[in-house]
Swiss-Prot record:
This is Cytochrome c2. Binds 1 heme c group covalently per subunit. Keywords: Electron transport, Heme, Iron, Metal-binding, Photosynthesis, Pyrrolidone carboxylic acid, Signal, Transport. GO terms for molecular function: electron transfer activity; heme binding; metal ion binding. PROSITE patterns: CYTC. Belongs to the cytochrome c family. GO terms for biological process: photosynthesis. It comes from the Bacteria. InterPro entries: Cyt_c-like_dom, Cyt_c-like_dom_sf, Cyt_c_1A/1B.
Amino acid sequence: MVKKLLTILSIAATAGSLSIGTASAQDAKAGEAVFKQCMTCHRADKNMVGPALGGVVGRKAGTAAGFTYSPLNHNSGEAGLVWTADNIINYLNDPNAFLKKFLTDKGKADQAVGVTKMTFKLANEQQRKDVVAYLATLK
């Protein structure tokens, strides 16, 4: 009886840890739903209030063709900011703070002035991860 109970508890613990791991993984399907909030200003294939986001993962900041960026965003790209998954996840939490810290860390605090056009903040870390997984699917 005790052996059977231990087996059941072991299986339950394993299943629980699997579901916890799955919940924290990036989910492009969930990210697509989160992206609907972004569509107020963004599309994958054309510039609007914000730049086109197709191909953003891996792109140098401030370089979407035909989009006029704020000096803060442009300067970040000139200083070497590339939109890796981690950088986008951190940026979405607080765009202005992220860019200013990036420039300051690069020794360019004098260029860390003004604000980016991106006023939206996405506080939920899982949603940020999910939306980045979705952005990675856009070409």
